[in-house]
């Protein structure tokens, strides 16, 4: 930090006016100085003043942001993950409010170019916000899962077993899906999704729901050990369409369940 101040002061010496790094006793503005100690002064300006007085606070804020972004996943901490989701949900209205306020401010001082840029930014932010809600509602319509409103999620794996529907959020569409059964616990993509399972409970197909369509994966191979309720089953893509992942079980065959439309 001292080196940066010395460098800034050297630039200030070449440019002219210099200001001390510390604030004066009567206000928030930097104190004008003609002292010869170059390292205690730097070039005047709002940005430099802000960095000099708030660099520690910003470093703490950025450390928190890094922690939230890096460890904001359910497998690490649900609390940190909740903070991350809250930040992502609040970004759209905050940015929209800031761009509208900036557009109003620029219009008041007749800076029409910046006014136009602010309006364009507000429109882009609003469109992105609407697109998020549209895609989330489309995904929720197929899965009935609140994971649909996660801004990071674009696909949801749906597995029907034991008369229940289990879901797992995915970042993309997999080529194939592997279900692993370990001592009665069912795992998908390395995550536990159900317990108390046996080999007879494994489904003949699983689904991956997207906002625009549902992809059906059909069982093509499995290796199971009944005595220990352990094994695996592999599913590959077979068809895609406007299917519901919430398949009914009342007097319907497997084919009828599969073709149960949204």
Swiss-Prot record:
It is found in: Virion membrane; Host Golgi apparatus membrane. It is a multi-pass membrane protein. GO terms for cellular component: host cell Golgi membrane; membrane; viral envelope; virion membrane. Its main location: virion. One of its GO terms (molecular function) is structural constituent of virion. Glycans are attached at residue 32. Residues 69-77, 134-262 are intravirion. Residues 237-252 are annotated as: Interaction with N protein. Keywords: Glycoprotein, Host Golgi apparatus, Host membrane, Membrane, Transmembrane, Transmembrane helix, Viral envelope protein, Viral matrix protein, Virion. Residues 18-47, 99-112 are virion surface. It comes from the Viruses. The chain crosses the membrane at residues 48-68, 78-98, 113-133. The keyword DNA repair does not apply. It holds the Pfam family CoV_M. InterPro entries: ALPHA_CORONA_M, M_CoV. Belongs to the alphacoronaviruses M protein family. Homomultimer. Interacts with envelope E protein in the budding compartment of the host cell, which is located between endoplasmic reticulum and the Golgi complex. Forms a complex with HE and S proteins. Interacts with nucleocapsid N protein. This interaction probably participates in RNA packaging into the virus. Component of the viral envelope that plays a central role in virus morphogenesis and assembly via its interactions with other viral proteins. This is Membrane protein.
């Amino acid at each position: 930090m001292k080196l940066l101040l010395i460098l800034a002061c050297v630039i200030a010496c070449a440019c002219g006016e210099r200001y001390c790094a510390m604030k004066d006793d009567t206000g928030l503005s930097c104190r004008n100085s003609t002292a010869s100690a170059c390292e205690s002064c730097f070039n005047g300006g709002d940005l430099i003043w802000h960095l000099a007085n708030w660099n520690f606070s910003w470093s703490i804020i950025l450390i928190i942001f890094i922690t939230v972004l890096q460890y904001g996943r359910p497998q690490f901490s649900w609390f940190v993950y909740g903070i991350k989701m809250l930040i992502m949900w609040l970004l759209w209205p905050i940015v929209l409010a800031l761009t509208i306020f900036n557009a109003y401010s620029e219009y008041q001082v007749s800076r029409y170019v910046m006014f136009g840029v602010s309006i364009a930014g507000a429109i882009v932010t609003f469109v992105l916000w609407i697109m998020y809600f549209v895609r989330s509602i489309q995904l929720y319509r197929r899965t009935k899962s609140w994971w649909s409103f996660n801004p990071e999620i674009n696909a949801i794996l749906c597995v029907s077993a034991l008369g229940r529907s289990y879901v797992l959020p995915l970042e993309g569409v997999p080529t194939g899906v592997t279900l692993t059964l370990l001592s009665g616990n069912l795992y998908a993509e390395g995550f536990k999704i159900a317990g108390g399972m046996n080999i007879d409970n494994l489904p003949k197909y699983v689904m991956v729901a997207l906002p625009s369509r549902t992809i059906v994966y059909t069982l093509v191979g499995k290796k199971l050990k009944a005595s220990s309720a352990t094994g695996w089953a592999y599913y590959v893509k077979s068809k895609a369409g406007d299917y519901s992942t919430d398949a009914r079980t009342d007097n319907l065959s497997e084919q009828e369940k599969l073709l149960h439309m949204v």
